[in-house]
Swiss-Prot record, chain A:
The keyword Metal-binding does not apply. SUPFAM superfamilies: PLP-dependent transferases. This is Probable glycine dehydrogenase (decarboxylating) subunit 1. InterPro entries: GcvPA, GDC-P_N, GDC_P, PyrdxlP-dep_Trfase, PyrdxlP-dep_Trfase_major, PyrdxlP-dep_Trfase_small. Gene3D superfamilies: Aspartate Aminotransferase, domain 1, Type I PLP-dependent aspartate aminotransferase-like (Major domain). Keywords: Oxidoreductase. CDD domains: GDC-P (cd00613). HAMAP family: GcvPA (MF_00712). GO terms for molecular function: glycine dehydrogenase (decarboxylating) activity. The keyword NAD does not apply.
Swiss-Prot record, chain B:
GO terms for biological process: glycine decarboxylation via glycine cleavage system. The glycine cleavage system is composed of four proteins: P, T, L and H. It comes from the Bacteria. The keyword Glycosyltransferase does not apply. Residues 24-105 form the Lipoyl-binding domain. The keyword Ligase does not apply. Keywords: Lipoyl. This is Glycine cleavage system H protein. NCBIfam families: gcvH, PRK01202.1. PANTHER family: GLYCINE CLEAVAGE SYSTEM H PROTEIN, GLYCINE CLEAVAGE SYSTEM H PROTEIN-RELATED. The glycine cleavage system catalyzes the degradation of glycine. The H protein shuttles the methylamine group of glycine from the P protein to the T protein. GO terms for cellular component: cytoplasm; glycine cleavage complex. Belongs to the GcvH family. The lineage of its organism: Bacteria, Pseudomonadati, Chlorobiota, Chlorobiia, Chlorobiales.
Length: 444, 127
């Protein structure tokens, strides 16, 4: 069964239709030196059965959280996913829908996004949430660009320990703008120093950015950081893990002007790194500067509720050259997963997920701290993730634990740092936690 | 279409009204412009103190499905922006009155005479 029906005769007739005598004549405008000028080195043709078999054997080489006990975190977490999520999001109406420009035929998709926006507003304690962005890192970078656009200031201060990949994305975004400088706060005992932050603040600071919990899993003093930001007229940007908000205070409650986050923990699988979900919320006063799009609820001419794309005039398809953001597509399917996840769990369910993640992480940290040679690096309070100092290099710990079908955590050496970053979710049973601690004990 | 005889107009559909002191003027968009844009939902203006060259953008007016730039009819400085435009629909309702947008101090008041008069503007919009 051929997938590309493109025979010599087909090609001949296409060339004839376009009025040229050969393929070379068709591409005569492309200079010879930039053409490939050699044959493509493709594997021999294979039929569907063979291709399927090759791909399945490649996929089987992956080691996933389906077979391994995972303590991996660092921005992506192994939370339990209720089966209903997959059943709902795989409905073809949702799975295949592109941007719902035509409201008349897109009410289901529009309502799903509206529900997502409403749920995230409640979770983050904010007034307005957009229809989502690519991922947490780009949402954070867009938040900083938005702050610079709002107050016209140039300097950005990062308070505490931001995920290095988020820092890197932020730097990439700011490189294109002329003057913006990012100042990283000094970190002491796992969290940003408020005293050092005070010294960095002045009236040229556009925004203060904080990640809560931070990259080390520690809890920053977000109230003090927010106060300092506002005392100097800077916007306060918080990047918060959404599941942590089941036990921690919402960013809106401690004064965040813009709240962002990586939405993967809300119902999306880790998927080897994506696609993920960028959460982006603001206070009402900032809605006109919000990147991306919003879905609003209104009444139609018969007085019935209806859903529409609103505030889309700052997007590419209407004002490309003046769009406040280059992100036009959203992550609608991941946003839907988040909405379904939050709807299924409810407020009580989410706080149980967060509470169990927290208490199991603290149980494991206690067990690891008791193993000779191992210690918990920081004293700061943490949610479900913490840094472990190990008696042998973390990379060795990770490698040896793979033999026991355990993902031991993130080797911070990969980030130019030290230690092993260990994350625990509600999925880890006491038996698994004990097994992991016992196995670590054998390495000491 | 309402085109008051006492005002001057631009090809970009702004109007300007020279005030009695002969040095300042009010600027807004025409009745034709507001009717073409449809429901206006937001007006964003540069703050008082902003110096403008002729034809420089001094803000944007946003309707449900489009956004239009606002161009200074002549050079000058923004003295005041209309705080009443928090209710942007005012521009639809009263484009030459309470829907005015900025008050300008003009660099050269005589330059207003170079703009379109009501008859010329009426011809431009075909009615």
């Amino acid at each position: 069964m051929p997938f590309i029906v493109n025979t010599d005769a087909d090609r001949e007739s296409m060339l004839h239709a376009t009025g040229v005598s050969s393929f070379d004549e068709l591409i005569v405008d492309i200079p010879r030196e930039v053409r490939l000028n050699k044959a493509l080195e493709l594997a021999p043709a294979a039929d569907e059965m063979e291709v399927r078999s090759i791909l399945e054997s490649m996929a089987a080489a992956n080691r996933s959280t389906a077979d391994y006990v995972s303590f991996l975190g660092g921005g992506a977490y192994d939370h339990f996913l209720p089966s209903a999520i997959k059943a709902i999001v795989s409905r073809s109406e949702f799975y295949t829908a592109y941007t719902p420009y035509q409201a008349e035929v897109s009410q289901g998709t529009l309502q799903a996004i509206y529900e997502y926006q409403s749920l995230i507003c409640r979770l983050y304690g904010m007034d307005v949430t957009n229809a989502s962005m690519y991922d947490g890192a780009t949402a954070l970078a867009e938040a900083v660009l938005m702050a610079i656009g709002v107050n016209g200031r140039q300097k950005v201060v990062v308070a505490g320990k931001l995920h290095p990949w988020n820092s890197s994305v932020l730097k990439t975004y700011l490189e294109a703008s002329d003057h913006s400088a990012v100042v990283q706060n000094v970190v002491e005992d796992g969290v940003g120093s408020i005293e050092v932050l005070k010294g960095l603040m002045d009236d040229t600071v556009a925004a203060v950015v904080v990640q809560q919990p931070n990259f080390y899993g520690c809890l920053e003093d977000v109230e003090a950081i927010g106060r300092l930001a506002h005392e100097h007229g800077a916007l306060f940007i918080v990047s918060a893990n959404p599941v942590s908000l089941g036990v921690l205070e919402a960013p809106g409650a401690y004064g965040a002007d813009i709240s962002v986050g990586e939405g993967q923990p809300l119902g999306s699988s880790q998927s080897f790194g994506g696609p993920y979900l960028g959460i982006f919320s603001v206070r009402q006063e900032l809605v006109r500067k919000l990147p991306g799009r919003l879905v609003g609820m209104t009444k139609d001419s018969n007085g019935q509720d209806g859903f529409i794309l609103t505030l889309q005039t700052r997007e590419q398809h209407i004002r490309r050259e003046k769009a406040t953001s280059n992100i036009c597509s959203n992550q609608a399917l991941n946003a839907l997963q988040a909405a379904v996840y939050l709807s299924l769990l409810g407020k009580q369910g989410l706080s149980e997920v967060a509470g169990q993640s927290l208490s199991r992480a603290h149980y494991l940290a206690g067990r690891i701290a008791a193993i000779p040679g191992f210690s918990i690096r920081y004293n700061a309070p943490f949610f479900n993730e913490f840094v472990v100092d190990t008696p042998i290099p973390p990379s060795e710990v990770v490698r040896k634990m793979l033999e026991k079908k355990v993902f031991a955590g993130c080797d911070l050496g990969e980030f130019g740092d030290e230690g092993l970053l260990v994350a625990v979710t509600e999925k880890r049973t006491k038996a698994q936690l004990d097994m992991f601690a016992d196995a670590l004990g054998e390495l000491a | 279409m309402n085109v008051p005889a006492a005002l001057r107009y631009t090809k970009d559909h702004e109007w300007i009204q020279l005030l009695d002191d002969g040095a300042t003027a009010l600027v807004g968009i025409t009745d034709f412009a507001q009717s073409e844009l449809g429901d206006i939902v937001f007006v964003e203006l540069k703050p008082a103190g902003t110096a403008l060259k002729e034809h420089e953008i001094f803000g944007t007016v946003e309707a449900v499905k489009t956004v239009a730039d606002l161009f200074a009819p002549v050079a000058g400085e923004i003295l005041e922006v209309n705080a009443g435009l928090d209710s942007a629909e005012t521009v639809n309702q009263d484009p030459y009155g309470s829907g005015w947008m900025v008050k300008m101090k003009l660099a050269d008041p005589a330059s207003v005479a170079n703009l379109l008069d009501a008859a010329a503007y009426r011809e431009l919009i075909g009615g």
